Amino acid sequence: MHRRNILSAALAASGAIFAAGSRSARAQTQPPSRDAAKVVYHLSDLEKVQFALGNIDNHLAGAGGPEKVTIQLVVHGPALRAFHAAAAGPETARKVAGIAKSSVKMAACGNTMRGQNVTLKELLPGFTVADRGGVVLIAELQAQGYVYLRP
């Protein structure tokens, strides 16, 4: 009886290893579906603006270009100050223009805009307003299957 249990366990383990290897091979040969490549970047820390914009550039390149991934950047809180056109540095302006050309959607929190007394026209080009708030938009995007990233 003991030998039979050992044999059964060995066969079960072999089957599990084979199945896992088979799934892994399929995952490497099949391209990801469009639905699997939706990401929302949450940015509220002023000191992380350049880092987050660099992450988005790297994400686009690593995914194989803007046609392979849908990215939405949602900015609120102190980080929004970096995107005021009058105060944005040249590096920020260049990176924002680049990701906007790559079809990255950018939304500014309407609550933060009111708090900072800034209008959409005063932000760098490419932004829309999250009228009900940045965190509300983030939650809605997550409900739509977006992966949440906060650099």
Range-by-range predicted roles:
Residues 5-25:
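N-terminal export signals
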Residues 20-41, 48:
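C-terminal segment of N-terminal export signals and the immediately downstream linker at the start
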Residues 36, 66-68, 101:
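Extracytoplasmic
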Residues 40-42, 72-74, 105-108:
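Structural recognition of the beta-strand scaffold that forms the well-ordered cores
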Residues 42-53, 83, 87:
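Short, glycine-rich nucleotide/cofactor-binding loops
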Residues 52-65:
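Histidine-anchored nucleotide/phosphate-binding helix
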Residues 70-82:
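Acidic helix-start/capping segments at beta-turn-to-alpha-helix junctions
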Residues 86-151:
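A cross-taxonomic marker for long C-terminal extensions/tails that follow the last structured domain
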